[in-house]
Amino acid sequence: MSEAPAPVVTFKKGPSRRPAQSRQRRRSPSPLDPVAEASASASGSNVVRPERKSLANPLVQGTKRRRTNANNEEEEDGVGGGLDEFDYAAEGGLTRKGDELATRANDWDLEDVDGQGQRDKKVRLDEDGEIVTDDGLYRGASAYLPTINKTRETLDKKMKSGPIKATSHVRTITLMDYQPDVCKDYKETGFCGYGDSCKFLHDRGDYLAGWQLDKLPEEGVREVEEEDEEEEVPFACLICRQPFTQPVVTKCGHYFCMGCAAKRFQKSPKCYACGAPTQGIFNIADKVIAKIEARNKARREAREERAEQTGGGGIEIGGGSDEEGSDEE
């Protein structure tokens, strides 16, 4: 016998059941359909919403009121103007000329005025300028009064403390006078350990600032002595920064005074300029001595020339006393 096929089970989805009293949303009528709007107004009642009262709050700003007013005016006039336009302009009384701000001033240190008032309360003077005695109450160490009577201006200057009051003028004129970067060692001694790699200027001339040039007289400018630039020989000791006294030279070629070199050798056997070992050998500096003698000779000759010029055309005082005495006799 042949077996019968098994029955196929089929599943069928049943209809969805909805409660009979379910609330359905009414279709909103189109604004272009006046018939539907009329039927809706006749069949049902409209929702009335309460109007919100606008409170005057300065922190809340908007353009709704201006837009509403503009639309109302547009409907009345028939011309669209949009939102109101405002023109902002500064007050005419604030305009000033350029020259008026040149001497503009302001009180920057207002705290100083209060401090002055507190000092006036502490130190009180009568009509004669005498300090008014205290009433006997103890008010702390800060309330002590000076025992020596002084004037009001002196008391104000002595008792004032703190930073200096800033200028009250807004516009100031400042002059900046910069000092040139001149090598101090080369200017004072004629020698610099850095040599050509020194970042400062190697010049022995005198540089004056602007305020120093203003103090110089117009006449009688000192003559600048010409120096021999071919031979770089120092003119002052590197240790004492004074003109040489008994100049000596080391093996490394640096010049010092005899006394300065001896004191330096007692502390350290190395050279003061370059740090090389000197081994206690100091030779006589013939070049420096010759340069000093040439300079002294030039000064003597210049002094003699000046004496001859002043002596030849000068006025002799009491030169004719002998002749007058002989004539009287």
Curated annotation (Swiss-Prot):
Bias (Gly residues): 310-320
Zinc finger motifs (C3H1-type), residue ranges: 177-205
Keywords, alphabetical: DNA-binding, Metal-binding, mRNA processing, mRNA splicing, Nucleus, Spliceosome, Zinc, Zinc-finger
Zinc finger (RING-type): 237-275
Region (Disordered): 1-86, 298-329
GO molecular function: DNA binding; zinc ion binding
Function: Involved in pre-mRNA splicing.
Native organism: Cryptococcus neoformans var. neoformans serotype D (strain JEC21 / ATCC MYA-565) (Filobasidiella neoformans)
SUPFAM superfamilies reported in the protein's UniProt record: CCCH zinc finger (SSF90229), RING/U-box (SSF57850)
Protein name (Swiss-Prot/TrEMBL): Pre-mRNA-splicing factor CWC24
Biased composition (Basic and acidic residues): 298-308
